[in-house]
Amino acid sequence: MSSIKETLEIIKRGADEVLIEEELIKKLQKHKPLIIKFGCDPTAPDIHLGHTVVINKLKQLQDLGHKIHFLIGDFTAQIGDPTGKNATRPPLTAEEVAANAETYTKQVFKILDKDKTIIRRNGDWFNKMSASEMIKLASKSTVARMLERDDFSKRYKGGQSISIHEFLYPLVQGYDSVAMNADIELGGTDQKFNLLMGRELQKQQGQEPQVIITMPLLEGLDGVKKMSKSSQNYIGIEEPANEIFGKIMSISDEFMWRYYELLSFKSLENIAKLKQDVAAGANPRDIKIELAKELIERFHSKEDAESAHQDFIQRFQKNQIPDDINVVELNQELPIANLLKEAGLVASTSEANRMIQQGAVKIDGEKLSDAKIIFAKGTNNVFQVGKRKFAKIIIK
């Protein structure tokens, strides 16, 4: 086990909040492995880089000697987490949940040590709970307390329906912490209300309340919206190595550091040195290559990482980018079609959309397929339309 100071530094790196740090120190002073809880509802089978922000933190705590209890919400997935939703989420069948859970855990073990991870399912206790016990659990909170949640409040004020079972979700998730006697629970910043509910229920049950560690939500490739499949701005960890490499290379030079902070296992000192190198004139592309190779090596292999790098170099060089490439500087974020028009690469947005559909638009040598992607400030990439039109576009 590392020292308390070292453990705190690792825990706090990249974290949004630690609630409550003094309580965490007291737990660490016991010098025994802590029960670290992380729960997920397997509502989809695939993991993307956004999910790995929390899982990476679990791995760090696992390496420090703590016990990772990875909770599969096979019961709660059939309720549907209302967090951040503007409408009632459709429930999944037990069969869908089981299939998703199987592939989800398989991918999780690309990061966590399987032999040191305890997999639990909340159906083990909730499927045995009687109706009277569930009603007793529901009595542990109030409607007023639930309406403190931003998403519930907005729906209520907007006249949108909120089902009773959605009010139960935070209580059910919170009770998981009681059943597991968790010392620490990790989650995204959007889960804070639910995590706090776990603390409240533990106190009511006479348990020492869990410490909460919230991790930031990773923005997607557009640098704006939260990474998600629905926004088509994600990188799946099971995508081919070449795809991962190309997508990492497509992020802006400025936004690259956000990915380093939340996804890389490099030390903060090492990352600071890379920033100094770029400030001194090093090519940001080379730094992005380092990140792409690190991630591919983690999810695939070192050989795949090197192969993807060589493939990228070959394809990029084949584009024969002219030495006198036109540099276009813009000062506002723009959808791809408008961006190409402003840069003079197309005559109209309709032409831009047509070229994208035809697969004739590339960014740093990677074919673009999403006609709805928006490029934010910090963009610094080479755009190609057809075989001969090039422009380096910078958004300040």
Swiss-Prot record:
Keywords: Aminoacyl-tRNA synthetase, ATP-binding, Cytoplasm, Ligase, Nucleotide-binding, Protein biosynthesis, RNA-binding. It comes from Francisella tularensis subsp. tularensis (strain SCHU S4 / Schu 4). The keyword Cytoplasm applies. One of its GO terms (molecular function) is ATP binding. ATP binds at residue 229. Its main location: cytoplasm. A motif ('HIGH' region) lies at residues 42-51. This is Tyrosine--tRNA ligase. Belongs to the class-I aminoacyl-tRNA synthetase family. TyrS type 2 subfamily. The keyword Zinc does not apply. It catalyses: tRNA(Tyr) + L-tyrosine + ATP = L-tyrosyl-tRNA(Tyr) + AMP + diphosphate + H(+). One of its GO terms (cellular component) is cytosol. Catalyzes the attachment of tyrosine to tRNA(Tyr) in a two-step reaction: tyrosine is first activated by ATP to form Tyr-AMP and then transferred to the acceptor end of tRNA(Tyr). Its EC number is 6.1.1.1. A motif ('KMSKS' region) lies at residues 226-230.
